[in-house]
Regions:
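Active-site rim beta-loop-alpha module in soluble metabolic enzymes
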Residues: 163-195
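Acidic (Asp/Glu)-rich catalytic clusters
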Residues: 13-27, 42-56, 89-92, 162-170, ...
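Structural preference for beta-strand elements that scaffold enzyme active sites
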Residues: 2-5, 25-31, 95-99, 129-131, ...
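Active-site beta->alpha N-cap acidic-glycine motif
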Residues: 1-39
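C-terminal domain-boundary segment and adjacent tail
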Residues: 130, 225-266
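Catalytic domains of cell-wall/extracellular-matrix polysaccharide-remodeling enzymes
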Residues: 74, 80-167, 187-190, 202
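Substrate-binding cleft of extracellular glycoside hydrolase catalytic domains
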Residues: 25-27, 31-82
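Active-site beta-loop-alpha junctions enriched in small/polar residues
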Residues: 7-9, 31-37, 103, 135-138, ...
Length: 266
């Protein structure tokens, strides 16, 4: 793991910021959060006013990205982005980059790309990279973790413009985004998952590819949040195994973090 991000609305954000402050060698950024997807573990916006469009009927953030795209007022989105970044900075974080929880600000559910342009604009204000792929390959379009709802023609018609805009405001971003999926036999056993990841990494194209995981230790708290807790435990096990690093090295993959990316894209 070379980079990570922190969710400002969540209760353990302060501890994570203190870790980042004590370990500046790690590239840790802000995971812009506009969805609250778990049934019983939920959170609300950081902002204390003008957040009505960002909340569901219970006052929490919307559970799904499509709800954000359909309901969010763009001025309230902008204010909440600033609030989350500034909250984590106040808690001790010097952010290395921005990314977005569940892709709720990408516009890929309904084609509301004004949200993505807003994020890029604010990332430029802070001088931070943002996780958004420079192009969309067929593998990305069909990736169930990315869960893109609009057609490739529509997204490709705008991605060039959005990336040109990102570069114009000084925002670095990876070339590709390709996370592992859980829709096949890799969900059945740890060995299957390991073999799947090892094969997936052989398919990475030339350039900067970001893949992401959600590693966690097995505990009652994790099991209380999600029924798919085993996936996160397997991710922790696999990516703490020295053999995985050896496999990555054998493929000629060079690991970088978001600070490296920012320097590369200057």
């Amino acid at each position: 793991i070379t980079s990570s991000t922190i969710m400002a609305p969540c209760p353990w954000a302060y501890e994570a910021c203190q870790f980042a402050k004590k370990n500046p060698q790690f590239a840790i950024g802000v995971h812009l959060t506009f969805t609250s997807e778990w049934a019983t573990y939920r959170w609300s916006p950081v902002g204390t006013s003008n957040t009505d469009s960002l909340r569901d009927e219970l006052g929490f953030m919307h559970p799904e990205s499509i709800d954000v795209e359909k309901n969010a007022d763009i001025k309230e989105v902008a204010a909440e982005i600033h609030a989350q970044i500034n909250r984590l900075k106040a808690l001790g974080l010097t952010p290395s980059h921005l990314d977005n929880h569940m892709g709720s600000l990408y516009g890929i559910e309904t084609g509301r790309f004004e949200l993505l342009q807003l994020v890029l604009s604010i990332a430029g204000e802070y001088g931070l990279p943002f996780r958004f792929p420079g192009t969309f390959t067929d593998a990305q379009m069909s990736n169930t973790m990315l869960d893109i709802k609009i057609d490739k023609e529509q997204i490709m018609g705008l991605v060039g413009q959005l990336n040109a805009y990102a570069h114009s405001v000084g925002v670095a971003n990876p070339d590709f985004l390709l996370p592992g999926e859980w829709t096949g036999p890799q969900n059945d056993s740890y060995d299957n998952y390991r073999d799947y990841i090892y094969e997936l990494y052989k398919t990475f194209p030339e350039g900067v590819t970001e893949t992401y995981i959600h590693p966690a230790l097995e505990c009652d708290e994790l099991k209380g949040i999600t029924n798919s807790w085993h996936r996160r435990v397997w991710e922790y096990k696999l990516f703490s195994d020295p053999k995985t690093k050896q496999h990555i090295d054998s493929l000629g993959i060079k690991l970088i973090n978001y600070r490296d990316l920012a320097e590369m894209k200057k």
